[in-house]
Amino acid sequence: MAKPTKKTGSKKTKRNVPNGVAHIQSTFNNTIVSIADTAGEVIAWSSAGASGFKGARKGTPFAAQTAAEAAARRALEQGMRQIEVLVRGPGSGRETAIRALQVAGLEITLIRDVTPLPHNGCRRPKRRRV
């Protein structure tokens, strides 16, 4: 009979990363917060869906705040102190996510809006009639 082999999972090493970049992608349906180091390697991430919200509640400002707090907590464990914030998208959770990062203890050095704007590219979706 074959002996059971012991599987060792990948160990996450605790790195000391003092500063980095927080990418906040805020759509109408969800908010995703990724915190990376200066080389671009993601240290921590969270989203409204990963924070336990489902359906239409993922697009709320409170869900964005919860996601940003969770990502900031993980980044602080890795030793991050200063971040630049790059915001993308038209969602309602943009400002609350930035405020949540600040309240969590991260010092924000720069806020930049990097929402992609088409130079008359694809046709827009039709208007909703409610």
Swiss-Prot record:
GO MF terms held by the record: rRNA binding; structural constituent of ribosome
Keywords in alphabetical order: Ribonucleoprotein, Ribosomal protein, RNA-binding, rRNA-binding
InterPro entries: Ribosomal_uS11 (IPR001971), Ribosomal_uS11_bac-type (IPR019981), Ribosomal_uS11_CS (IPR018102), Ribosomal_uS11_sf (IPR036967)
Ranges in a coiled coil: none
SUPFAM superfamilies attached to this UniProt entry: Translational machinery components (SSF53137)
BP terms from Gene Ontology: translation
Pfam entry (one): Ribosomal_S11
GO cellular component, one term: ribonucleoprotein complex
Family of the protein in this entry: Belongs to the universal ribosomal protein uS11 family.
Function: Located on the platform of the 30S subunit, it bridges several disparate RNA helices of the 16S rRNA. Forms part of the Shine-Dalgarno cleft in the 70S ribosome.
Assembly: Part of the 30S ribosomal subunit. Interacts with proteins S7 and S18. Binds to IF-3.
Protein name: Small ribosomal subunit protein uS11
Organism (species): Prochlorococcus marinus (strain MIT 9313)
Gene (UniProt): rpsK
